[in-house]
Amino acid sequence: MKKLTLLVAGLLSLGSVHADEGMWTLYNLPQPVFQAMQSEGFTLPQDMLYGAPNAISNTVVNFSGFCSGVVVSPDGLVFTNHHCGFGAINAHSTVEHDYMLNGFYAKDFSEELPNENMFVQFMKKQEDITDRVNTLIAGKNADKTAEILDSLTNAMTAEAKKIDKSFHVEIDPFYEGNKYYATTYQVFNDLRLVFTVPKSMGKFGGETDNWMWPRQTCDFSVFRIYADPKTNGPAEYSKDNVPYHPAHW
């Protein structure tokens, strides 16, 4: 968490450095931007953001395709925003146990609640495939371009699955379509709810306070990744699965 705090603080500080405004992928972080981060107090080597075996990017997850999260323990605990857990919290709430209204916490592993159609993805690799894509889509209309990108995504995913069947590839345009990156993800589908605060705390201030600083709100919820007990790898939900043990957190 200390590393993540430093990263976030470093990135937020760039708002005051006019020449370095904007958002950048860790894979493609320009040297002037990194130097600006250093001038604001960031002390880690650049490959600790992306590239090193224990880089910060290895602990950050795509949370169910619509949020982000961070792994914070050797037993696979993941912190994300409070609203990112709404689907799971609502699904488990009843009249007798209104977890959205009153919050929830699991006293031990056995009380952690499984969730259908929720997952986390770890970014394993990101590469610039702009030249390859531009060659394929030159002169094509929007529909044909989408078809070509889908085909390329499927082909790259098939190659990635030869390395690990839990891998898949996503191709996305960046910088208003001037760049295309292919990102390889590893997907874990057994994700269980561990803790959430009452909605009155998690949504305190509502949209009035959203995007403001400081905020007086408990904007977080906690989940745990579960894995195959034999491989520590991804697995569909099973009562026999065990908490995931990440190499870094």
Language-model region placement:
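Terminal presequence/propeptide segments associated with secretion/organelle targeting
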Residues: 2, 8, 15-249
